[in-house]
Amino acid sequence: MSNFKSKYHDELIANAAYIGTPGKGILAADESTGTIGKRLASINVENVETNRRALRELLFTAPNVLQYLSGVILFEETLYQSTAAGKPFVDVLNEAGVLPGIKVDKGTVELAGTDGETTTQGLDGLGARCAKYYEAGARFAKWRAVLKIGPNEPSLSILSIENAYGLARYAVICQENGLVPIVELEILVDGSHDIHKCAAITERVLAATYKALSDHHVLLEGTLLKPNMVTPGSDSPKVAPEVVAEHTVRALQRTVPAAVPAVVFLSGGQSEEEATVNLNAINQVKGKKPWTLSFSFGRALQQSTLKAWSGKEENVKNAQDALLTRAKANSEATLGTYKGNSQLGEGASESLHVKDYKY
């Protein structure tokens, strides 16, 4: 039982439930300056503040798109940016009924004495940052822990002490300052493991994480989970969406408490269409699913939009149309009603996998 007490108790529960509204999901637009630079470089656009702001404005002002979103995760720079006309992005989102969120971790660092295993940085000063972000309009936060599957990893000590407990400390600090914490656990798709290995590791990781959250008295009703879907490794043959769905839902059923209002999947390098089709299959699985099963996609919502835009003002409408197509498709997938799209935008079927992905 959580002993969490805070003036934000009811607000946290309400905001977490709102983000988990069926038919809606999260746009992850919180790429660091370095990561968004790589995205811009792929379309031959310079990584400067004006271009980063232009891309975010394109995303946040796309006609009819925000109706399919309940939240947008921002990078710190973006939280304080405005449209070209001077309207703060936070106001643009709030007026459309979309909650602004904020990335609060400081990236990963390799742990000495391990075979490339990592822990996430950013706990120092987190409380003060969260208070500042809440004041600026953010209502939820994201912290990404990264694990990989290999012959000997993730090790139990790294899993439970470093990453699970780091996530738990982050979560309770966020809640003390009014932010709903997204607990993000990404098991990288890198490797040749089969889907059964991924399922076993995913279950182990989730079980350790919820043990840590309980130990730290985190209010589960005021949290969200952002896990990977259960898939084979990138060097293994793909399996049908129904197989991904079966293994993913079973892993959640075995480990995620019903008190959690929503599970918002990361795309993990899947193509836009693959991520949507798999999400749709997950929502078509019969059986006990006490949480909303939705999306928190970055690359898998933006790839065809980036390709269509290419940094040119005259392409903004086409780029926003591409974003609308993907947002609507993923909204349908959260309801299990997506029928597929015969007219995919450029890049929608392109694998977005990057080995040892840094966000």
UniProtKB/Swiss-Prot annotation:
Provide any one GO MF term from the record: fructose-bisphosphate aldolase activity
User: Which residues does the record give as substrate binding sites?
Assistant: 52, 142
Annotated pathway, please?
Carbohydrate degradation; glycolysis; D-glyceraldehyde 3-phosphate and glycerone phosphate from D-glucose: step 4/4
Q: Which Pfam families match?
A: Glycolytic
- Major subcellular location class: cytoplasm
Q: Where in the cell is it found?
A: Cytoplasm
UniProt keywords (A-Z) are: Cytoplasm, Glycolysis, Lyase, Schiff base
The protein, known as:
Fructose-bisphosphate aldolase, cytoplasmic isozyme
Q: Could you tell me which species this protein originates from?
A: Cicer arietinum (Chickpea)
Name of the encoding gene: ALDC
